[in-house]
Amino acid sequence: MNAKILRLNKAGIPVSWLTREETATLLVKDLVIWSLGDTVMEIRGGYNRQGIRSILRLPSIVACGGKVHKDNYDPPLENKFLFRRDKNLCLYCGGEFAWGDLSRDHVIPISGGGHDIWTNVVTSCRRCNNRKADRTPDQANMELLAVPFVPNQYEFLYLSNHAVLADQMEFLSARFSRHIQIS
């Protein structure tokens, strides 16, 4: 099983996804201060003198100590996350496409003063991107089907893992903004 474990800081804010090995290390070093969710895996160790085998149970969500940063969260803008945010839909024609047939479109083109930021990029099929060219949607007489948004930390962790477990999804989705919709 290759399930990832959701790592939180001590305030309960998601930080990253962990492998089973990373989670086991945190548990053994007693760095997990609390956990949630079901056991996703058991790691069996050796036997002690009394013949008792050690078992390490990995929960689906772990919280660790450390500093809690209050900075504004700035998720990395990569096509794989952008396409997942927009559900592989072209936000001009509404068609659903494979990743290889999608591209990143700047609503306000870079040449027109636009920036490569979450709130200025959408998923577009190659046909619509070529049709829009180096113009705004208004100039190209094309309608944008959704408003681009910056995913919060909870949404970004969802976007960055294709195999979110049910209890992890319950935890993350409770803090999703109204912008993101889960299929």
Where are each of the predicted segments found?
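Short helix-coil boundary/hinge micro-motifs
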Residues: 1-74, 79, 142-183
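Short alpha-helical basic/polar micro-motif
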Residues: 10, 123-126
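Histidine-centered nuclease catalytic patch
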Residues: 75, 82, 95-123, 132-148
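Glycine-rich, histidine-containing beta strand-loop boundary motifs that form or position
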Residues: 18, 93-96
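Short aromatic-cysteine micro-motif
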Residues: 79-87
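Alpha-helical hydrophobic/aromatic positions enriched in membrane-embedded helices and signal peptides
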Residues: 1, 97-98, 128
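Short cysteine-rich clusters marking metal-coordination/redox-active sites
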Residues: 90-93, 125-128
